[in-house]
Amino acid sequence: MAYNFNLIKDIDFLVIPLGKGGGSVGAFVFCEKILKEYIINKSRKFIFTTALPPVNHLWNLFILNKMESKEFAVKRKELFKRIDFTLKKLKEKGIKTNSASHIISVVTGDNRKIIKIEKNLREKGYFIYGVKEPAVPKNTARFRISLNPEISFKNIENFIEELKYELDTVF
């Protein structure tokens, strides 16, 4: 996001985590040399942390090289198409979300409703789990819909139809 808004030059610490989306562990921190030296010499958590094993460094390098590839750029473009499509279809169906990324939250507010809907959707072949209290604040139980570039537009559309039906009919 900082890159897209041309803000990199204004950021003191640029942290690039490699977990979850990066499929690995660890992170990169980009900063001025004086800040790097300060962290190395003064940060207790850094001082008493061991380095990642060499296999993790090699895996991270492999992942970063993949992220620079043409194939990855094509997949990223396809993912953004699916994000736009999904958000448009959710809006058309009156399903509210504040999300704008490939992980889309749909808040239902009720743990019991989430449990019933996730059971019904799994029986229909959708791999979905709700996020319930206490993992989220009271009355904000939700589904997190994760998109990837391999999901067909038809499957997204079918899922949204089923989700809408469940949201309208459960309780």
What are these regions (language model features)?
Residues 73-84, 91-124, 135, 147-149:
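Conserved PLP-binding catalytic core of the aspartate aminotransferase-like
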Residues 3-38:
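Active-site PLP attachment segment
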Residues 25-26, 43-52:
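A short glycine-threonine-serine/GTX helix/turn-capping micro-motif
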Residues 123-124, 135-171:
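PLP-dependent enzyme catalytic core of the Aspartate aminotransferase-like
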Residues 57-74, 91:
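Amphipathic alpha-helix from the class-I
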Residues 38, 42, 85, 89-93, ...:
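Generic non-transmembrane alpha-helical segments
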Residues 38-41, 59-62, 74-85, 158:
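A non-catalytic, amphipathic alpha-helix used as a structural packing/dimerization or gating element
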Residues 128-131:
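Membrane-embedded alpha-helical bundles of multi-pass transporters/translocases
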